[in-house]
A protein has these predicted regions:
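Active-site-adjacent helix-turn-beta-strand microarchitecture at beta-sheet edges
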Residues: 63, 130-211
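Extracytoplasmic
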Residues: 80-82, 92, 118-120, 153-155, ...
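Small/polar glycine-rich anion-binding or flexible loop at a beta-alpha turn
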Residues: 104, 263-270
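Zymogen propeptides
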Residues: 2-151, 167-168
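Short, solvent-exposed aromatic-acidic interface loops
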Residues: 100-105, 172-176, 233-237
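Short acidic-glycine loop/turn motifs at beta-strand connectors
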Residues: 88-91, 160-166, 197, 222-226, ...
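Structural recognition of the beta-strand scaffold that forms the well-ordered cores
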Residues: 122-126, 157-160, 167, 221, ...
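Conserved, well-ordered active-site substructure
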Residues: 134-152, 205-258, 268-300
């Protein structure tokens, strides 16, 4: 009788342990914030942003002040609604990044529009959604938050330097600390690169599962010093099919970019400008924003 009681007790304890472990795993994946580090100092200069906004000239498709000029145009490419943003800044300091909830950590997310508004962004798009992965460098505002090499480093990362220049780097070739020493301020790890040295780096026959698929897209490129372009496309709807990576690269090249890089796309693709969402983000078949880990933005 004692044997059965002991066996029952052990079984019950083991079952409770398994249940607790499974429950925690589910919570960690879908619920718990698991904030690793709160970013105490934001780079946003609220006073400067308010001053600039007060004197800026704005329309539905443009923004202009003494330091920042933004022009938005829309066009149809391959049955897809595409938004092109031309950006000129007086200093690379106005090209910025921000974490959702001003916090670095897995499962810490917010809609692009919310993070943008919290940082007084003039223009913003979703970033690389670093929180969806457990590996890959995370460098923001010159701080290394994660230094483990991404599982697939062949895609390359977009390194943004203090002077505003872009370079495609590969994590298995250089450490995160060395990148910061070399002047990297922000690093975006999604990919792949679309254009390097003015030439398209993807083709219609490579990465068929990704390049040939029509999807919403977000990409950023550099034309010249302090002159950038952001392209966002809608997709997955009857009105807008979406772009392949090659088609996205073609759009970028047509604007004369030297380097262009593919950011997180699909349901994450969101364009925020002058206080509102411009495109039509799709999440689970509906027009709505997806919460993401981070944004790239123009602002003070």
């Amino acid at each position: 009788m004692k044997f059965f009681k002991k066996s029952y007790t052990y079984a019950a304890c083991f079952g409770l342990l398994l249940t607790s472990s499974f429950s925690y795993s589910i919570l960690k994946t879908f619920v718990l914030s698991d904030a690793i580090q709160t970013v105490k100092a934001t780079t946003t200069d609220t006073k400067a942003a308010k001053k600039a906004a007060a004197s800026a000239t704005t329309t539905d498709t443009s923004y202009s002040d003494d330091n920042i000029q933004v022009t938005l145009t829309e066009k149809t490419v391959e049955n897809t609604q595409v938004y092109i943003v031309d950006i000129t800044v007086s200093s690379a300091d106005y090209l910025k990044t921000a974490f959702a909830q001003n916090t670095y950590g897995t499962n810490v997310t917010a809609k692009t529009s919310v993070t943008a508004a919290n940082n007084s962004a003039i223009l913003a798009v979703n970033g690389d959604y670093y929180g969806a992965n457990s590996t890959g460098y995370v460098i923001r505002n010159g701080v290394v938050y994660r230094d483990t090499v991404r599982e697939d480093s062949s895609n390359g990362d977009l390194a943004i330097y203090k002077d505003g220049s872009f370079k495609i780097i590969y994590e298995d070739e250089i450490s995160a600390d060395q990148l910061v020493k070399d002047g990297v301020v922000n690093l975006l790890a999604f990919g792949p690169s679309l254009v390097e040295n003015g030439e398209i780096t993807v083709d219609t026959n490579s990465e068929v599962g990704r390049s040939m698929a029509s999807n919403p897209r977000t990409a950023i490129g550099i034309i010249d010093e302090n002159h950038y372009i952001i392209v966002v496309s809608d997709g997955r709807t009857s009105e807008s099919e979406g772009l392949s990576l090659y088609q996205l690269a073609e759009v970028m090249k047509s604007y004369g970019v030297k380097t262009a890089y593919n950011l997180d796309g699909g349901g994450s693709s969101t364009l925020y400008f002058n206080g509102q969402v411009i495109n039509k983000p799709t999440t689970n078949g509906t027009i709505s924003e997806r919460a993401v880990s981070d944004i790239v933005y123009i602002g003070y």
